[in-house]
Amino acid sequence: MKRLLQKIYHCSKVYGFTAAGAVAIVGIVIYERSRNNPVFSSWTTNHDPSVKWDYNWDKREPESVIKPPKETATDDEKLQYKEKLKKVPTATRHIILIRHGQYYDRESLDINRKLTDLGREQAQLTGARLVDMNYPWSKLICSTMTRAQETADIIHKQLPDLPREECDLLREGAPIPPEPPSGNWRPEKQFYKDGARIEAAFRKYFHRADPEQTNDSYEIVVCHANVIRYFVCRALQFPPEGWLRISLNHASITWLYIRPNGRVGLRTLGEAGFMPVNKVSVL
């Protein structure tokens, strides 16, 4: 502003502007600048999110699953289409992700990577926690890796009536190259192979309820840290490359829910507060 005033003063001397004329010019310049740089009373008055929520992230919006009528369709066919669009989900899906307990991670073969004594205690504590929560659990799903199966076995003994299934898609792996990069180098083909599988697992288990589902569901999924961290980023529509910045304790509980309209929320991330301090571990 000081330099601007100096220039105007110089011009007034050279071109013979009057003082009043110079003041008028200054006023016009200040006014134009204020229009280009408005000041708001709060950031919320004119806030545009950098990334907007994709409501059709699971491709289950009614318009995506119901075939539209042809241009030559009759009025009755068009009316039927509109009625089908009104049939939308009403239930919420709760997905409880549980990391396996501590295990012997220095073994090379999966069959030998069993739970340690501490890992078995952790799984027992998590099972007891699920019992105390007393939700109408729908089913128990687990990875086919040894440490996940052993964790699921211990939990299932405390919830014996719960239907159980296993899924190879939930096996541990490298979902996507992390950002910033990890100090542990991995060949690109590993991300290429594991990433597609873990993404397939996400698409299989993460979606809003079907319109036919009338009650909220509570599914328990026992799997692995990398898989869970990737799921959290994808479900919340955060950059998935950030998965490695999240840390999860062994046998911890991560709770995501999917509303009928496609909104997703995170209730807990890596909850292990139900364990005594000396039973908590991450590696």
Regions found by a protein language model. Name each.
Residues 268-283:
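Acidic, His/Gly-rich catalytic cores of divalent-metal-dependent hydrolytic chemistry
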Residues 101, 225, 272:
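Active-site metal-binding loops of divalent metal-dependent hydrolases
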Residues 94-95, 212-226:
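Generic beta-sheet signal
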Residues 5, 18-167, 188-190:
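Active-site-proximal alpha-helix that buttresses catalytic centers in soluble enzyme cores
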Residues 1-17:
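N-terminal mitochondrial targeting presequence
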